[in-house]
From Swiss-Prot:
TM region(s), chain numbering: none
Biased composition range(s): Low complexity: 475-489
Domain of life: Eukaryota
Gene: Zswim3
Protein name (database record): Zinc finger SWIM domain-containing protein 3
Stretches for region Disordered: 434-490
GO terms of molecular function: zinc ion binding
Listed PANTHER family: SWIM-TYPE DOMAIN-CONTAINING PROTEIN, ZINC FINGER SWIM DOMAIN-CONTAINING PROTEIN 3
Length: 695
């Protein structure tokens, strides 16, 4: 390891760094880091993900030689700073201090202290958190602060739009169809005394499988729309620290009984609920006592994600100066992504200036000083913290935007049922505008999950027999998303453009309209203008970049926008294998400018009217053969073209051949005509021969 050493990927550095640690018999930990995903998300860059970090600092923390389970931290000034250089497109060691100072430095085998290559510029606070010995000591449920009490027994919004009996019937049909087409899915809703929807809970079979795989931690995300309806999304965390939705619940009013019923339904749907060890909630969640009662073996903790977003919101709304905002943003970033006692203490002191006394006291008691919370956060790995925060940003933004943009609760429910499995897609994938089919294929080796009957809860639970679900198959089309009322006006808009504009203008605008129809629209007012963002449907691109599931690539066999985006991310050029033969210059001699097979051996006699129809059929057949041939590649394409030419020459009228065709023409002999396109073994491949065409 030398100052200025460069590495193409993080794996290359890791291999060299491992050899260095083995040689010096010293251990290093990450003290400070900025991941590529975090940097790309916040700065709009597209750095390669295989470099893993834009900047990372390793400090020496060598383990004692007595091999005890506990580690003693040596206060050693040795460190290494690895940074990414965009110009070089390489990771390089920008700072290096090899001055190891240990209690047993003579036996450490490290580099002598008299040969430092750099000077330690500054001393960062230790990353280790002071963890209490007894982490299993249960905390008594605290009294909810006043900023949470306004959500307890909150009356329903008088401006809420009631659901008519016809809408209730539509919801019932949609949920029955949802249960029919997705075996293992579950749903339940209750109707109040006013015959209005009080609560709706549902989850797909994929969500059930996700919770069964990762039941240890549960996070509740709360969204409220303009009409006062409440949506709760239940999320779990997989081993890569990516958040996944496992349950949805919609409440007309957030009261203690409705929340208790919602949580009880979740436990009924998921038999692995006793495995939940921790439940993370928003700081404003007012029903912690109910949550503790239904999950008695789980600890209720404040979500790091939601508390961080709360502090960011408070900072944005405050009137403090720009310098303080910048310093607190940096302190918040260090506390979350480089957690340590010092960083948490610094953030706590700055938050005291920003927050009111009650909220600050609540966060100080349940977030800043919660050793179990930060111990778990650090234990799972600070390097994966970016993944955790980014995945929550993606999932919660999808859920919140879809729930808040709908005008009615009925439309909202219909959209969530249709898009239920699109919330757990990797990356920022859009929700398709067209209603997707809920039918799914199940592997033959996977047994179908036991089906729970659909329930409508009124004064008491009424269970519908499963046989009744079959009656709704004929009406399943009606239970899909209702067609927009202004569909005719949209079609009329295109008709007017077609009538008043040129053909080219209409075609170009129609292409844009197709993009709009296959996208999710994020529209927000930004001052005097409107910010519009289109999120297109996701498509599957092969790793070699030769194929994509989009219609453009399937039709033209050219690199589409999705393949080009993949190549741009990996900084690779377009390869020859990504372009179909019909677009390559070296195969253009096989086609004429009109895209038809070139064959100068036949000149149609247009003076004979009775043969004009035959000539048209020949042209059509020629175009079709050209399209079929150009779907093949390389030698196979040349072989098939040579075979077709040979057949045409045999069938051609000798009197119609021009003088130029009387000359010998070279063909590749591929065998007897009945087996012209058969695959021959290499040993049986015939030699090249000359075929003479005589008059």
């Amino acid at each position: 390891m030398e100052l200025g050493s460069c590495f193409k990927t993080y794996e290359d550095f890791k291999e060299c760094f491992s050899a260095y640690k083995k040689e010096t018999r010293c251990s290093f930990i990450v003290r400070d880091c900025i991941s590529v995903r975090f940097h790309n998300l916040n700065n709009g860059t597209s750095f390669r993900e295989d470099i893993l970090y834009v900047q990372v600092k390793f400090v020496c923390i060598r383990t004692q030689s007595n091999r005890k389970k506990t580690r003693k931290v040596d206060r050693c000034p040795a460190y290494l700073l690895l940074q990414y250089n965009e110009t070089l497109d390489r990771l390089f060691i920008s700072e290096l201090n090899t001055q190891h100072i240990h209690a047993d430095s003579n036996a450490s085998g490290g580099i002598p202290a008299s040969k430092p290559q750099a000077i330690c510029l500054h001393k960062l606070p230790p990353v280790q958190l002071s963890i209490r010995k007894d982490l299993d000591t249960a905390e008594k449920p605290s009294v909810e602060p006043s900023f949470c009490l306004d959500k307890i027994h909150k009356p329903s919004n008088p401006e809420q739009e009631g659901i008519s009996p016809s809408d209730m019937a539509k919801i019932a049909k949609v949920m029955k169809n949802f249960l029919t087409v997705d075996e293992g899915s579950m749903a339940s809703f209750s109707v109040g005394t006013s015959q209005d929807l009080d609560r709706l809970s549902f989850q797909s079979s994929k969500m059930s499988d996700l919770f069964a795989r990762f039941p240890e931690t549960l996070l509740l995300h709360r969204v409220e729309n303009s009409q006062g309806h409440i949506l709760y999304a239940f999320l779990v965390e997989n081993k890569e620290r990516e958040s996944r939705v496992v349950h949805f619940a919609v409440l007309k009013a957030e009261t203690a009984p409705s929340v208790a019923k919602m949580l009880n339904i979740f436990t009924e749907f998921n038999s692995d609920w006793p495995k939940v060890k921790m439940v993370f909630v928003d700081p404003s969640f007012p029903h912690r006592a109910i949550l503790q009662e239904i999950f008695p073996s789980a600890r209720t903790l404040l979500s790091i994600y939601h508390t961080t977003r709360l502090l960011e919101k408070k900072l944005h709304q405050s009137s403090v100066n720009a310098s303080f905002k910048r310093l607190m943003k940096e302190a918040l970033r260090e506390a979350v992504f480089v957690s340590s006692d010092a960083s948490l203490k610094n953030l706590c002191e700055m938050s005291q200036v920003l927050l009111d006394e009650e909220l600050f006291s609540f966060l100080q008691a349940h977030w800043f000083s919660c050793e179990l919370l930060w111990y778990i956060h650090v234990r799972k790995g600070l390097h994966a913290c970016n993944t955790y925060m980014d995945s929550l940003d993606i999932v919660t933004s999808k859920v919140s935007s879809l729930f808040r943009e709908q005008r009615s609760l009925l439309d909202c429910i219909l959209h969530f049922v249709d898009y239920i499995d699109f919330f757990n897609t990797k990356g920022l994938k859009s929700l398709p505008t067209n209603a997707p089919k809920l039918r799914r294929t199940r592997l033959p080796s996977t047994p179908p999950r036991p089906k729970k009957p659909f329930r409508i809860c009124g004064g008491g639970d009424t269970r519908l027999p499963v046989e009744e679900v079959e009656e709704t198959k004929a009406d399943s089309a009606q239970s899909q998303l209702p067609q927009p009322q202004d569909q005719s006006s949209k079609a009329g808009m295109l008709d007017i453009l077609h009538q008043s504009g040129s053909e080219l203008a209409y075609k170009l605008c129609h292409n844009e309209w197709e993009v709009v129809q296959n996208s999710t629209h994020l529209v927000d007012e930004a001052g005097s203008s409107v910010a519009v963002q289109l999120l297109e449907n996701s498509h599957q691109v092969s790793k070699d970049g030769c194929s994509c599931s989009c219609s453009f690539q399937q039709c033209y066999h050219l690199p589409c926008r999705h393949i080009l985006a993949l190549l741009h991310t990996s900084q690779q050029p377009v390869g020859e294998a990504m372009v179909c033969c019909r677009w390559q210059k070296k195969y253009q001699h096989l086609l004429d400018p009109n895209g038809e097979l070139q064959d100068r051996g036949i000149i149609p006699n247009t003076d004979q009217p009775e043969k004009q129809g035959q000539n048209h059929m020949i042209r059509d057949l020629s175009r079709e053969l050209a399209n079929l041939l150009m779907q093949t590649e390389g030698p196979e394409l040349e072989e098939r073209c040579s075979t077709l030419r040979k057949i045409v020459d045999i069938w051609a009228d000798p009197y119609q051949l021009p003088e130029s065709s009387q000359q010998p023409v070279d063909f590749r002999d591929v065998g007897c005509l009945p087996f012209l396109w058969g695959k021959l073994e290499e040993a049986d491949s015939p030699p090249l021969a000359e075929a003479m065409v005589h008059d």
